[in-house]
């Protein structure tokens, strides 16, 4: 009895390990399919990338083709590993167009997306001696067709074998581990991804530092001296707008009332009217200097920000390759996040920018921008902006979910709806 119990435990552990391996392979294949779908949406408006866009340069086309070929190779590899480790009755559900016995609906949706992506690019040649040398743009004569879901019997027969599929999976894993070129391939892939990641992070750092440094340097050494010299020629130009003048008047009036209040409470030595006028005049001069500097600072901000925006635009125009690497890096990071984390991030950002409390945040942002450029605050414009812009932003976001996210990640959309409810 102990012998049979040991065999039963070994079989159960083997099945559990195969199930976990199949789950990981499915997730990796699904991430590769999502990445290819994102490339199609970005470069070909959702169509296949068999024909690369003509507006891309030759170098960009080569880089995109290599990236697509590598991702397709990974997709086919993990899809094949998944088929080896997954029981046959679960794969039958995909061939019949419905979930198999014990297959979750989300896993079935992922398999459908994987098969749809592979169907758009065909299958690699069966007799190829080196799969790494297979071209991405293969013709129908040189590619193995994707199984037709309608031919159920033929598909199931082709997927069955005399020995259990897990045995072939174990031998395939062992052969891959004993391959003398496997370590070099892993190191090469790691170095390639590491280089792309460093370039993407360095470019993000440049996108942040270049505008900030340009704004500060131009404001301190170029725009600042010019504005100070021009405004010194007109001593009467103190206030940039009427709102600053009103604020200065309120401050001066409060100071005058404070002096009289302290005099009445006898907290300060008694002052004559002449002494009160003298102190008020000194305070007025301090306020005038303060608002003259604030007005000059607002003018400096306008020209310094224009120079900073020009530097940012030049950086974007001259860094097209870095932008492509940054997009690939962002896609890998985003598609590597779980569906629940994606839904959480989406809900967080939507509640911040278009949620119930977002009008207060938009009001603070608009007031800060107005003060930064020395523009008088227009309450009517602020309320009109708050009443229209978040609504437009919410409409764009819902359209993006309907057209884009619902197609590449239906499980994330389902999780988002459940969490939002």
Swiss-Prot record:
Keyword GTP-binding listed: no
Coiled coil residues, start to end: none
UniProt region (Disordered), positions on chain: 124-153
Subcellular location(s) per record: Cell inner membrane
Comp. bias (Polar residues): 125-144
UniProt keyword Zinc, yes or no: no
GO MF entries: proton transmembrane transporter activity
Keywords linked to the UniProt accession: Cell inner membrane, Cell membrane, Hydrogen ion transport, Ion transport, Membrane, Transmembrane, Transmembrane helix, Transport
Cellular component GO terms held in the UniProt record: plasma membrane
Any matching Pfam family: CemA
Protein origin, superkingdom: Bacteria
Membrane-spanning parts: 203-223, 298-318, 345-365, 381-401
Membrane topology listed for this record: Multi-pass membrane protein
Family: Belongs to the CemA family.
UniProt function note: Required for H(+) efflux immediately after light irradiation to form a rapid H(+) concentration gradient across the thylakoid membranes. Together with PxcL, contributes to transient H(+) uptake following dark to light transition.
PANTHER family: CHLOROPLAST ENVELOPE MEMBRANE PROTEIN, CHLOROPLAST ENVELOPE MEMBRANE PROTEIN-RELATED
Protein name in the entry: Proton extrusion protein PxcA
Organism this protein belongs to: Synechococcus elongatus (strain ATCC 33912 / PCC 7942 / FACHB-805)
Primary gene name: pxcA
């Amino acid at each position: 009895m102990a012998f049979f119990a040991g065999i039963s435990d070994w079989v159960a552990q083997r099945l559990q390990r195969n199930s976990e391996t199949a789950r990981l392979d499915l997730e990796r294949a699904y991430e590769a399919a999502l990445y290819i779908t994102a490339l199609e949406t970005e470069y070909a408006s959702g169509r296949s990338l068999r024909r690369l866009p003509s507006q891309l340069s030759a170098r960009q086309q080569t880089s995109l083709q290599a990236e697509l070929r590598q991702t397709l190779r990974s997709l086919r590899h993990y899809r094949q590993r998944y088929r080896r480790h997954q029981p046959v009755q679960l794969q039958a559900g995909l061939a019949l167009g419905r979930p198999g016995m014990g297959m979750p609906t989300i896993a079935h949706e992922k398999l459908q997306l994987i098969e749809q992506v592979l169907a758009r690019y065909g299958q690699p040649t069966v007799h190829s001696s080196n799969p790494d040398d297979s071209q991405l743009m293969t013709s129908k004569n040189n590619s193995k067709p994707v199984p037709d879901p309608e031919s159920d019997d033929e598909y199931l027969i082709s997927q069955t074998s005399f020995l259990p599929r897990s045995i072939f999976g174990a031998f395939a894993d062992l052969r891959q581990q004993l391959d003398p070129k496997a370590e070099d391939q892993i190191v090469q892939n790691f170095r390639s991804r590491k280089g792309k990641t460093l370039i993407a992070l360095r470019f993000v750092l440049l996108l942040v530092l270049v505008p900030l440094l340009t704004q500060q340097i131009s404001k301190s050494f170029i725009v600042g001296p010019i504005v100070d010299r021009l405004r010194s020629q007109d001593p009467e130009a103190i206030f940039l707008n009427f709102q600053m003048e009103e604020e200065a008047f309120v401050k001066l009036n409060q100071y005058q009332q404070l002096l009289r209040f302290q005099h009445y409470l006898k907290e300060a030595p008694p002052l004559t009217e002449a002494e009160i006028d003298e102190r008020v005049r000194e305070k007025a001069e301090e306020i005038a200097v303060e608002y003259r500097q604030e007005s000059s600072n607002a003018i400096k901000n306008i020209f310094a920000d224009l120079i900073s925006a020009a530097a940012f635009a030049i950086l974007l125009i001259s860094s097209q390759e870095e932008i492509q690497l940054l997009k690939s890096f962002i896609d890998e990071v985003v598609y590597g996040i779980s569906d629940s984390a994606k839904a959480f991030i989406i809900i967080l950002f939507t509640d911040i920018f278009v949620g119930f409390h977002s009008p207060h945040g938009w009001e603070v942002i608009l007031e800060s921008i107005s003060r930064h450029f020395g523009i008088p605050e227009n309450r009517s414009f602020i309320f009109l902006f708050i009443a229209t812009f978040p609504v437009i932003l919410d409409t764009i976001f819902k359209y993006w979910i309907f057209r884009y996210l619902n197609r590449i990640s239906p499980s994330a959309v389902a999780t988002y709806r459940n969490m939002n409810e």
